[in-house]
Amino acid sequence: MQKHRRLLKSKDFALIRSFGESWSNKSFVLLARKRDEMYAEAPSRFGFILSKKIGNAVIRNRFKRQMRNSANGLDVKPGHDIVFIARNRIHECDYKEIRRFMGKLVFGANLQAE
């Protein structure tokens, strides 16, 4: 995922947590916030949160790679900041299910590009 499509600063994550809307399913929570008007046509940015309850660093990084790769394939409206928070049940999911659950959340949040 290109750098301009990633959320990197903790300030951005805090803004989304405070002012964003949320949707969830059994494996993920999606937080989304529309960006300022001057960024309305900019590509949407993604962030990923996995707590230490998920597992050790190797396991968390494996799931993060799968989530990043799945997010690359999502067709999302421009001008949004989106954070995916993995729940502990992510252990029950394989890559195809991760992709499907993330896609369903984006669709349910009405963030899918036309």
Short names for language-model regions:
Residues 1-114:
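Positively charged, solvent-exposed patches that mediate nucleic-acid binding
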